[in-house]
A protein has these predicted regions:
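Internal maturation/activation junctions in enzymes
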Residues: 328-426, 440, 455-456, 574, ...
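Bacterial N-terminal signal peptides that target proteins for export
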Residues: 1-8
Length: 618
């Protein structure tokens, strides 16, 4: 019973975490920060500032984004990481389009039925809270490869990582989000030695008594979790020091990727796995490699859309949905009108049905991407739906083939040379599997849940998958991460955009692009607008309801009025208000940068922690 409830609260918390990430200075996030030299946008003010400082010292956007990424691993522990993986989409100053896949890989000891319990039933707790849930991390390999291949050459890796090392070794003030998260997940952190040492301030007699009571079944699990959360240890502005993480970062700064995938850090990872029935071995770490992939490129009303291909499902789905939307006069529709939401929902259903069947790791499964992103295929798919009535998901199947992956973080950088970079990384759910590698100081991912195990099963975000995304050794799980670049009809960078939020990443990036291209909004104004989401299964429209916790943001909410909801219900649509008990009043957090008329404009999400420094220009 305890494990099942842990899973339930884990999922609810994933959807509610950012509801508490709200700073008092929110109005500033709605300004379009602008300047002429460069910009960085991320979920952490400290991380964005690190990137900008590197630019000021002569670095390019690639140097800046690597500094930002390593700093996020310290200052944003719920999603920033060195224990996870991600994707990069970039356009260099010379016009080269680059996409790098540093997604986690399944350990060689993994197998398709690894998350079945002794009774043969699928165990969410094994898939999310055990050491078996961890894939081989790729973030370190990816960031170092970006630095080596595309950095300016003006810095050493130690200089790039100095900000992250300083904040880990000497401490930094936590924001409201981290204070809330450390307390909210207390009952799970207490199950792990490393997490207890970092995230529990004082292992009090009250905590010990509660643990004894629940183990002896003298109090129910729900009461135990509630009482643990009611013990408030952390406040915004408290200082957190992460000495072991600092040591790990120093090893990486000195030895490059070998500072993580070999030597002392590798020893610590493997020892952690052996002690806790995990699967990652020395060979898995030694053999890990990031991979440059063929970019996914499409067009929308003359603009070029550059995104990530498989194992990301984001690029193919975004371009497929834009291809379908090109058949409608979107510019004439009011955003979030009944007509607009109905059209958008039908398009989303069609694309997510294809995601479930056709997409997976291209090294293992030949995904029919050319078919999925063709404009003819988009028109053919639209024949399955009606613009007058909702089409049940049961009536939508994946398209026939022509023979032949809540917790992420996105960060972007653009410089005056023309380099444009977007990176999305993840450890899957907030704080991953809540396990810290003892002695190494970093959280492990639970990305193995992003595989379809068993095929046909829904993951933590309700996404369903089949053979294309089944578990196999050294395979990379399918992802929803969608770093995307929009180029003008003349081929120049207009915007880099991405989001955090599991399956809702794709539809968030889509709606920002629509608002910029069809409605001529700035990246900030596009991010501000309320959003909706549908993904085939479950067959509902999710929308952003009124924020019960911070009413000052309700100028943007709800994304759908009661009148519009009733009108859409008459068309046959079903609904799920984001304002469920989890407190999730919004769907995802977007971050981006726009370059227009010789100026850089940052776009940061008020759904995040609301700090103006999330987006920095100079």
């Amino acid at each position: 019973m305890k494990k099942n409830l842990n899973y339930l609260f884990l999922i609810l918390a994933t959807f509610s975490l950012i509801a508490c990430e709200l700073g008092s200075d929110y109005t500033k996030t709605n300004q379009n920060l602008k300047n002429k030299n460069g910009a960085v946008s991320s979920t952490s003010s400290l991380a964005s500032a690190a990137g900008i400082d590197i630019m000021k010292k002569g670095g390019n956007a690639f140097d800046a984004i690597v500094a930002t990424g390593f700093t996020l691993a310290v200052t944003s522990p719920s999603n920033g990481n060195i224990g996870g993986g991600g994707f990069m989409v970039a356009r260099t100053a010379e016009g080269e389009i680059v996409t790098l896949d540093f997604r986690e890989k399944a350990p060689t000891l993994s197998y398709e039925t690894m998350f079945l319990d002794q009774e043969g039933n699928y165990s969410r707790n094994l898939a999310l809270l055990s050491h078996k849930s961890s894939g081989v991390p790729g973030t370190v390999d990816g960031l170092i490869r970006i630095f080596n291949d595309y950095g300016s050459g003006n810095f050493t890796l130690d200089e790039i990582m100095s900000y992250a090392i300083d904040y880990a070794e000497n401490g930094h003030a936590i924001n409201k989000s981290s204070a809330w998260g450390f307390d909210f997940y207390k009952h799970l952190f207490l199950e792990d030695k490393g997490s207890t040492e970092i995230f529990i301030k004082n292992y009090s007699l009250e905590m010990r008594q509660l643990q004894e009571d629940v183990q002896n079944e003298t109090i129910p699990e729900e009461e135990y979790i509630k009482k643990m959360r009611d013990i408030k240890e952390w406040n915004e502005g408290d200082i957190i020091v992460q000495k072991d993480l600092a040591k790990t970062l120093k090893r990486i700064a000195t030895n490059g990727r070998d500072g993580f995938y070999r030597g002392e850090t590798a020893d610590l990872i493997v020892n952690e796995m052996k002690a806790n029935n995990g699967l990652i071995t020395y060979e898995d770490l030694k053999d890990y490699n990031s991979v440059y992939r063929k970019p996914i490129v499409g067009s929308y009303r003359g603009y070029s859309i550059v995104s990530m291909g498989p194992p990301s499902s984001g690029g193919p789905l975004i371009i497929q949905m834009l291809n379908m939307l090109e058949n409608f006069d979107v510019a004439s529709m009011t955003r979030n009108s009944t007509e607009f939401v109905h059209m958008l929902t039908e398009v989303q259903r069609l694309a997510y049905a294809d995601r479930a069947i056709h997409l997976g790791d291209p090294d293992f499964y030949p995904s029919p991407v050319p078919m999925l992103i063709s404009k003819d295929y988009a028109k053919k798919r639209l024949e399955l739906v009606s613009m007058d009535m909702a089409t049940p998901s049961t009536d939508i199947a994946a398209g026939s083939t022509i023979p032949e992956s809540m917790e992420t973080t996105h960060y972007s950088a653009m410089d005056k040379l023309g380099n444009t970079v977007g990176i999305t990384t993840t450890i899957n759910l907030s704080y991953g599997n809540k396990k810290i590698v003892d002695g190494a100081g970093f959280l492990l991912n639970n990305e193995m849940d992003d595989f379809a195990s068993p095929p046909g099963n829904q993951n933590a975000f309700g996404l369903i998958g089949y053979e294309a995304n089944s578990i196999k050794p050294a395979k990379r799980p399918l992802s929803s991460m969608s770093p995307t670049i929009v180029l003008t009809p003349e081929g120049e960078p207009l915007m880099t955009i991405g989001a955090a939020g599991g399956s809702r990443i794709i539809t968030t990036v889509l709606q920002v692009i629509i608002s910029v291209v069809d409605h001529n909004l700035s990246v900030q104004d596009a991010i501000n607008l309320g959003r909706t989401h549908s993904q085939w299964i479950p067959d509902v429209i999710r929308y952003e309801g009124k924020n019960k916790m911070n009413t000052e943001f309700n100028q943007f909410l709800p994304s759908l009025s009661e009148k519009k909801i009733n009108e859409l219900k008459k068309l046959g649509h079903k609904f799920e208000d984001g304002n469920v008990e989890s407190g999730m009043y919004y769907l995802a957090r977007a971050h981006g940068i726009m370059y227009k008329n010789g100026q850089f404009f940052t776009g940061v999400d008020w759904r995040g922690n609301g700090e103006i420094s999330d987006g920095v220009t100079y």
